[in-house]
A protein has these predicted regions:
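Polar/acidic, low-complexity leader/linker segments enriched in S/T/G and N/D
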Residues: 1-13
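Short, solvent-exposed beta-alpha or beta-beta edge segments that form flexible loop/patches at the rim
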Residues: 18-53, 57
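Short acidic, glycine/proline-enriched loop segments that cap or flank alpha-helices
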Residues: 40-46, 62-67, 85-89, 101
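A generic structural motif
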Residues: 57-65, 119
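"Short basic amphipathic alpha-helical interaction patches in structured regions
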Residues: 66-76, 127-131
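An exposed acidic His-Trp-rich patch
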Residues: 74-114
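Short, charged interaction patches at domain edges and termini
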Residues: 99-166
Length: 166
């Protein structure tokens, strides 16, 4: 299963210049399990939401060669495009990042980013699954969400009104 931290880590690794990314590391610091059970469709069931603080660090970041604002911009872009909607759904509002920068010498610094992230803990029936639940075997899965692109809404008569793409 790919986590939000996995996604953010891969994004930074793909977009930060190689020299600046040599001392890069990412890990989870602290985790809270939020009860948020519900049927999410397609035979899937969400047990809970895992909220944690992601720590990403760059040792010996060459701030004179690579503008440190690149890291901030990349985080903002990733948050806008990839951050889990489960944060809003479960009422998690404080998603502000904390940046800690320590100068090492005239050309490098250690940069540490801490940011709250969340992942859904979703299971699906699977005869070979490792999780016994409600008389069945289940496996952990990445949530699969289907989005309707069009529909027809019926009111009081048989003439429907199309919605979305046709």
């Amino acid at each position: 299963m790919k986590t939000q931290l996995d996604s953010l880590t891969a994004f930074f690794m793909q977009n930060v210049p190689e020299r600046a990314g040599r001392g890069f590391d990412s890990q989870i610091d602290g985790m809270k399990v939020i009860s948020a059970a519900r049927d999410v469709g397609n035979g899937q069931y969400r047990l809970s939401v895992l909220r944690y603080t992601a720590l990403l660090s760059w040792e010996r970041f060459p701030f004179r060669l690579v503008d440190p604002q690149l890291l901030v911009a990349l985080l903002e872009v990733w948050m806008d495009e990839h951050a889990a909607p489960v944060l809003e759904e479960t009422g998690i509002e404080n998603t502000e990042a904390d940046w800690d920068v320590t100068l090492e010498d005239e050309e490098t610094a250690t940069v540490v980013l801490s940011i709250p992230l969340a992942d859904e803990l979703v299971i699906r029936p699977d005869a070979k699954g490792l999780i016994p639940y409600r008389g069945e075997r289940w496996s952990l899965v990445e949530p699969e969400i289907w989005t309707a692109l069009s529909a027809t809404v019926y009111g009081v008569d048989e003439s429907g009104a199309p919605v979305g793409e046709s």
